Amino acid sequence: MKEKKKITIMSIVIALLSISLSVLIYLCFFADKYLTDLGYTKQQVKLIHQYQLEDEIKEYNQSLIYALNSEDFNEKNIHYYLLFNSQIDYTDSINKLSELYSISELKEILTILDYDQTVELVDYDKISNIANFKKLIDKQYTVKDSVSLTNTLAEDALEKFLTLPTLEDPTVFTSLLDKGYDVDTIISLYDKVGAETFSKLSNFKYFSSLSEMLEDSSFNFSLLARYLMYMDDQGVSVGSAIYHVSSNDDFIEDPDFSSFYDNINEVTDTSLTVLVNKSNKLSENYVPDNLEEVSADYRNSMQSLQKEAIEAFIKMSDDCYAAVDRRILVYSGYRSYEAEESLYNDYIAASGDGDSSKVDSFADRAGHSEHQTGLAIDVCQKSYSYNEFDECLSSDWMYEHCYEYGYILRYPSSRAFLTGHYFTSYHYRYVGVEVAKLIQQYNWTLEEYDYLFD
């Protein structure tokens, strides 16, 4: 009986050993064959066995191999590596993603983005709502913008934002929100000005009355600065300002030019759009950093301008010559504070009675001249005086095309009440192409642009 029991036990042991041997043979041969058939090398198969990944391998995974052989390998992130299968070694980036997102979150993201886009997420804050992020990606926004908008906009704001066509620069929307505009006002503004103008409003100032203005059927964006100025000057309501400005009631044919000097602001920002006029004064020590001499073929006499203004002028002058066979020249460019002071005093002396009010109607006091910026030019047509420019072929061409090169006619007709100067056909100002296009589109003066934009 004991012998029979011993035989039974031995049989069980042998059976178990046989099963174990079969499993071992399977693991060593058949399982390995499955992995090698997928393309893994014997060394890679050993690593897969080492981390017990056999049951999770369904295909050759280059990202896993990169990770297993990388000095950045982190065993706790093995299942993150398995989510990727890229020919690029993203091991370090995957490690960083594991610190931001759970496995389930990353799986969801990978249904929205490809590997390269997903790796880009390491450069941004964690996505606060993946479902909302997907809506933005579906609207063709970039990964960066989609993350920013998802994390910035509240749920209701995002839903309203998504009703807009895809914006060229969605940061304009968030910039306007940051300045204090509500979502409905921003959408109304977009509807009023259109996509092209809206894309240029990132430095648009905050005006508490804009929402009410946009609701007025007579509102005209081109008159916005004048509405606001009229409200400030007259203390009237939005509706009254729109009515009176639309009726041109703010127009003054012959303003008191000396009164422009009553409240003077010191200019500290000397960017391309710097406003220098009778109310905004440059320091007597200000000299532009990048002044260069205008080459002889493009000037009437020795003149200097800021480099960018020169380059734009040369292109404009060449194109004018090609179009109408007439050459535009710089008659006067940069003038120092001292030169402006001397010129103004000469005008006073020439007036006979020393009456500055007469001189203020056509000249600027020292520090108040745009010529000191190195961005303003008085022009003439070759072989003609600047005073005759209005009668020249090149004048018509320049007036029509100047904005394409970043220049604006600085003192247009019927705007002296804004600019402090009567119409001057030969005086142009460089502000850069984008700003010049906007000013041309809405028929603004630089004063109006400056009133509306930072």
PLM segments and residue spans:
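N-terminal Sec-pathway targeting helices
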Residues: 2-18
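Hydrophobic helical h-region of N-terminal Sec-dependent signal peptides
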Residues: 17-25
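Extracytoplasmic cell-surface/polysaccharide-interacting catalytic and binding patches
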Residues: 25-333, 337-454
